[in-house]
Amino acid sequence: MYKRHAQPSQLYNPDLKWETSEQLNIGLDLRAFKDRFSLSMDWYKKKTKDLIVSNIIIPYEAGNSAAPMNAGNVVNEGFELEASWRDNIGDFSYSVSGNIATLKNEVTYLDPHVSGGRIEGSTTMASNGSFSAFEEGFPVWYFRGYQVDHLNENGDPVFRDNDGNGSINANDKAMIGKPMPDFTYGLTLTASYKNFDLSVFGNGSVGNDVFMSYSYNRILYSLKEMYDQRWTPQNLSAKYARPQLTNADKYGLSDAYVFDGSYFRIKQIQLGYTFPKQWTKKIMIDNLRVLSLIHI
């Protein structure tokens, strides 16, 4: 005899509520020198409360997984600044503008019922575990892993024993990076002379890290730097461990795979020419402009 039944997949939480946010902004706008110079500034602080999380510890006798609960607070703080200058000299006109935006965020509270005191995030290889975490006192989803102290005489990594118990385990993991930049910035240059015009735009970021543990699979995603600077008997001062190393699971979750993500690049260059109206009117066109656009 077979019986069919249904049951809730998780417990009910009658106290669950919407997340809330409070934000304070202080701004300043300034124009000077007959509008040739402009400046805009904005400082902000945003507090988000009662974040909904689900990694909650409950007794086994409950029979189900725990319901989501309001268990976290986050603070984001920073400022945004934009300045520009424009002028002309005869038939030549130009403008220069730049902007910068900073961001500092921190998890200010996480309910003690959250399993392990943190929420584990993304994984690279399931067997290696997660490499990011949401934890009180740290930036949102910071990179968490092992720290390589040095390479031994065989080219294997020696990890830092942060808890001092003589063995390397998950308790030795520490903050090894963060994905969010300290600040982002952009720069725009424009110039025109008679019928020609040019604009250049670039942007960048500073202080963000990139975790590239997928390079752990050297067959498919090998980085040239790791290949060139790998340990060999002829290269004892190498930066990276030897291929087929021991403790590969820990090495794949270590700061060996954290790279500086700061960058600046030119994203767009545009060159244009506007035909004189006395030419275009002859073919019944009010305005005609051709341009060459490069996206990088």
Task: Please provide the spans of the model-predicted regions.
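Conserved small/polar residues in nucleotide/adenosyl-binding loops
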Residues: 1-5, 294-296
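Outer-membrane beta-barrel signature, preferentially recognizing the C-terminal barrel domain
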Residues: 4-38, 64-89, 178-184
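Membrane-embedded beta-barrel scaffold of Gram-negative outer-membrane proteins
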Residues: 18-62, 94, 101, 105
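Transmembrane beta-strands of outer-membrane beta-barrel proteins
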Residues: 26, 37-39, 94-96, 187, ...
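Short loop/turn motifs that connect adjacent beta-strands in outer-membrane beta-barrel proteins
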Residues: 33-36, 88-94, 107-113, 277-290
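Transmembrane beta-strands of outer-membrane beta-barrel pores
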Residues: 43-49, 85-87, 100-106, 193-195, ...
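Conserved small-residue
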Residues: 69, 88-179
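Extracytoplasmic gating/loop element in the C-terminal half of outer-membrane beta-barrel translocons
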Residues: 205-290
